[in-house]
């Protein structure tokens, strides 16, 4: 199925989603990669607030290229999500609702997604220019010294995504190949 969602996201918004469903996401999405995640953990360890509201938030693992004239952002393809696995359960426990990236996640992240009623969505890898078409605005909100890894506030419209991990334990990296093999077997 395809769903149309608006941030901030609630558990009720995410509960119907199943691995393999598609989503058109609109609203505010924050960008953060490895270095930004490390700094967020430092803030939390010091008892300080995060630089953006985490409750119901969506984080996109991306380091966009500089924007071209007349564009809000340059190419904005996803980075490998596994690099954020060490930080993710803590953010999910604080209310992070959605992560956007590519690639498999650790068992700890999968369990935390289920425990927190969250989702992990895939952006189209290798199609950064296509993904950028959905970005209406982009502003660096903290840590500009990180360059492309600075935390940005994106406003997106109909951002095309696929559910990889759902709130019920569904995992497209497991169910997808199994469905393919079953379909292939039925043809022979």
Name the predicted role of every residue range.
Residues 1-9:
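Short, structured beta-strand/loop micro-motifs enriched in basic residues and often containing a Trp
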Residues 9, 29, 64-66, 158, ...:
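A broadly conserved detector of short glycine/acidic/proline-rich loop/turn motifs that flank catalytic sites
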Residues 25, 133-188:
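C-terminal binding/interaction regions
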Residues 31-159:
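Feature captures the catalytic cores and cofactor-binding loops of soluble hydro-lyases/lyases
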């Amino acid at each position: 199925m395809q769903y149309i969602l608006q941030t901030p996201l609630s558990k009720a918004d995410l509960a119907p989603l199943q691995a393999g469903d598609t989503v058109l996401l609109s609203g505010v999405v924050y960008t953060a990669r490895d270095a930004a995640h490390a700094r967020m953990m430092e803030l939390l360890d010091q008892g300080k607030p995060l630089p953006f509201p985490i409750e119901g938030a969506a984080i996109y693992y991306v380091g966009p290229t500089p924007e071209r004239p007349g564009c809000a952002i340059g190419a904005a393809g996803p980075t490998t999500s596994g690099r954020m696995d060490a930080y993710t359960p803590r953010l999910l426990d604080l209310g992070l609702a959605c992560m956007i990236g590519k690639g498999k996640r650790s068992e700890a992240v999968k369990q935390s997604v289920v425990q927190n009623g969250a989702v992990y969505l895939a952006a189209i890898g290798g199609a950064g220019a296509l993904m950028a078409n959905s970005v209406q605005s982009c502003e660096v909100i903290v840590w500009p010294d990180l360059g492309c890894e600075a935390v940005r506030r994106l406003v997106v419209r109909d951002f095309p995504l696929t559910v990889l991990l759902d709130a019920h334990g569904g995992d497209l990296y497991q169910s997808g190949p199994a469905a393919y093999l079953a379909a292939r077997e039925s043809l022979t």
